[in-house]
């Protein structure tokens, strides 16, 4: 991996402004996130990413630089990375005094710099200490009026890759006789369709075979079920993406998980893929009979 292909981000800013939330957003976008990394170790972390052979291509570190020594260490680390052709982007998070005071009151914790004084005194002290760092940031986000989802959208816009907001779906066929998949977000029940198991010529085959697939989809209500469930998945998927959820697990069930659920899961997976969803189709119970 070359220096140019390693993407580095530094997350810093005021206490209570959302550093941890921003870090979680980046983690959901596929970044390797390290919390509370001493600035002096930033170059070491970048070198580990460089040596990973592409396994780690995007690294974000949350840095607390309230101490003057840490501030000097961060500046030295950034300069060292710049000299090697690795140019980290710095995100600085801030919020109004009123918003920060409310947040500290809500969690019932003191500000780390307030000492024996008020929360607002600690906020003002930290704001002064970090003023120079704020001026050097590539992106400053004011989170005063942002909820978690709005902050996530801004992080996504700034640090996400193309199609980073794409929904990724796992479609699992299963047999009810073996139990529901524990990680399913949605469950589609195909047992209203006639069972190919009772058609002797089809019994040895599975829903992946054309004979069974064609039989299942030719049954009354089958194509309508696939059409309407696809429409439902589009609606739900769009809502998931708006809410910042990137992964959906759909379980498609029949009695044994061999014929109907397999055929329908394949159809739904193909429909989702055609809509631009990242799809993985898994047939959990094939071969269990």
UniProtKB/Swiss-Prot annotation:
Keywords: ATP-binding, GTP-binding, Nucleotide-binding
Nucleotide-binding in keyword set: yes
UniProt binding sites for GTP: 64-67
Binding, ATP: 13-20
Keyword Nucleotide-binding set for record: yes
Example of a GO MF term: GTP binding
Listed HAMAP family: RapZ_like
Function: Displays ATPase and GTPase activities.
Family: Belongs to the RapZ-like family.
The protein, known as: Nucleotide-binding protein Franean1_2060
